[in-house]
Amino acid sequence: MKNIIKATIVLGAAALLASGCIKETFPTGSTQTKDQVSKQPSAIDGLLNSIPAAMVTTGTAGHLSSYNVHYDFGIGAIHMATEFMLEDIATLGDNPGYNRFYVWCLNQAQGDTYISCAYFWDCYYPWIKACNDVISLIDPETELAQSQSQLGQALAYRASFYLDLARLYIPKENKYIPIPDEIKELTVPIVTEKTSEQDANNNPRAKRSDMYEFILSDLALAEKLLAGKSLGYNTPNLGVVYGLMARAYLEMGADGDEGAYEKAITYADLAISTSGKTPLTQSEWQDPVNGFNNGAANNSWLWGIGCTSENFNNIGCQAAMLCCEGQWGYAPLSQLGLNKATYEKIKDGDFRKASWLDANAQAHAPLAGSAADGKVFLYGNEDLQIPAAKPYESIKFRPAQGNCTNYTVGNAIDAVMMRVEEMWFIKMEALAQSGKLPEATALLKQFMDLRILDGSYSTAKLGDLDSFIDEMFFQKRVEFWGEGILIFDYKRLDKGITRGYEGTNHPLVWAFNCEGRSPQWNIVITRGEYQSNTAIVNNPDPSQFTKNWTGAE
């Protein structure tokens, strides 16, 4: 591995420290600001396009330049960080410090004084600022189709960002760290195109009900503006708006809002019918060229964010961290894979199981690249400093174009934002939670027949709500492994994590377990915000809320 020089990692109860040198190249793309554009639709396009560009650009939060952290690459990094707070991504490499998200794995440095705490905030709020800049330039009563489309997209982006923030930062009860009464039901401050600097300095966290009212108002206007507009998967189109509504109403239903589950069902159906999208086929899922890296190559993705060589460097991007078949970056060294216990529970006839190597480190789906590239992945290469593949290692996310050797090609993967399969699961959960368990069970059976193709999947043992939710949740974990949406399911459904068990393939340094939801999922607000915004009351620091599993329990 010629792009990586050997590093030494010290693993201990108190710290995980990495030292090493990595040669980097830097992106050359640029963005525009509100002051640099006029109110002409053609000029606003550049400002609008800067939003998705910022979402996948190396160094987007300023943490790479300020702190030299290599996980600063935007929405893909946020998705990975949240996945590492869960249980299903195991770091299999001999040196787990090559997983640059180790602070989230360890549940260390999650308090307000740490850069890891600040990362989500330092991504989302600048992106929201870019949305506000576009929104401020367009009259919502405009009759120009291009302007309507631009405003609708900006509103949908903003709603998506606030929906993520609301779900990440709202403190939920757990068995480890009490939630003070003063912060219950609080999300994050709302900043719009009309918020002054003075207002921002005394801007309290919005109550849950107020935040969802704001999000849904943005989406309602976006729905109106985007109706009849033909937009591709790489921007929030009308189907995406309905998908975001379905996500929001599912959360509201879980929080007890009357009628919310029924609306979640309605909007999930609308997202499916409006988009015309269908679940991935086996050939699309296992495609060694386009698998989970190219939304244009399938009929499943409602939304994905494209990435070009202008947006990334050689190691600071999602592919370099996640695509294990690539011969550069951290992925072939951290060797991310599936939790062994989860793998063993997946039925052998489920074609998704081939997303990971088996217990003997053998592949059951085509490998990316040439036959020689496949040998490098499976058996390693001393000259390239690439180790042999590990049991349960991932081949779900392929390098772009199946290119395993050239990072300027292979790193240009799309970030998946929404697949139609999620709408199926939203509908299932909402049906079950609203007292329609037989319909929910039938829908799960219908979906699983698209994954276990011989029709042998059975729901006979799912006769009550709890057993159904457990099974649906497990299948959703398998379906969306690594895609960055599962933290919201864990948090909403009050599910725990199990990394420590006999035979675990998680590094013991972060093999902790928790019963029910983890306090780590109540993200702490960065000190930079509450020092400037006097109205902030923060979430408690969850760092190291429990001890690691030692094998004695």
Where are the predicted features?
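Sec-dependent bacterial lipoprotein signal peptides
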Residues: M1-G20
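Flexible, polar/acidic helix-loop-strand segments at domain edges
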Residues: D348-R419
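Membrane-proximal, proline-rich intrinsically disordered regions
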Residues: C21-H79, M321-G337, T342-D348, R352-N360, ...
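Conserved, well-structured interaction surfaces
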Residues: G93-Y169, A206-D210, A220-L231, T408-A415, ...
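Short, surface-exposed recognition loops and adjoining beta-strand edges that mediate ligand/DNA contacts
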Residues: Q32-D35, H70-I75, Y169-K184, G228-A319, ...
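Structural register within alpha-helical repeat arrays
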Residues: L151, R158, L165, M245, ...
